[in-house]
Amino acid sequence: MWQLVSSTALLLLVSAGTQAADVPKAVVVLEPKWNRVLTMDSVTLKCQGDHLLRDNYTWLHNGRPISNQISTYIIKNASIKNSGEYRCQTDQSKLSDPVQLEVHTGWLLLQVPRLVFQEGELIQLKCHSWKNTPVRNVQYFQNGRGKKFFYNNSEYHIPAATSEHNGSYFCRGIIGKKNESSEAVNIIIQGSSLPSTSLLLSHWPQIPFSLVMALLFAVDTGLYFAVQRDLRSSMGNLKNSKVIWSQGS
């Protein structure tokens, strides 16, 4: 009886754990994908997550609610005050991880999707100009050395990142008759030998589930062998027992 109650309790624990794990996080997506923009740029943030047709969306900027209840939040003319951390949530999903938006001033800005990459990943760099003003003779630099030159402004792609791509990057180009340069950004390349923290965290609900299932299997297996042992013992006692007949019976 105790084993049956324990198995039932464990099954209820598994059910509750899987239901909690089934609620996904919402995700904030930037369009365009760059999280570093210039003043007057337009930026669209999209909240992706499980939702019903009439669900409301909750947006937070630096922890404060935004009066926006739809899936997209549009910044038409970005200013410094739009910089900061953005998060979103739907009625059917948990609060998203934060996405950082940086609004800068200047003629040129080196844009990159993020500053930390894993070995083997694609790195995309863009020399972005204020109000998309035409730029020519664009050159990308790493640690002060020229790496790529374009007569017309183009993105610079590094197909597979290695440790050699660690360092400080900036771009330079001619706008009108002036030679302009962007501020430098530091890019870090991490080794790929160990899984990332986010990858480990994404699988954490499966770990206790696996342990509980293994425990259930062990309990059931133990009960099976215990019953088999008792049956063999009973059969053996029956065979070895002597039956005494009395004439009067």
From Swiss-Prot:
Residues 228-249 are cytoplasmic. Keywords: Cell membrane, Disulfide bond, Glycoprotein, IgG-binding protein, Immunoglobulin domain, Membrane, Receptor, Repeat, Signal, Transmembrane, Transmembrane helix. GO terms for cellular component: external side of plasma membrane. Disulfide bonds join C47-C88, C127-C171. Forms a heterooligomeric complex with ITAM-containing signaling subunits FCER1G. Interacts (via transmembrane domain) with signaling subunits; this interaction is a prerequisite for receptor complex expression on the cell surface and intracellular signal transduction. Binds the Fc region of antigen-complexed IgG. This is Low affinity immunoglobulin gamma Fc region receptor III-A. Residues 1-20 form the signal peptide. It comes from Canis lupus familiaris.
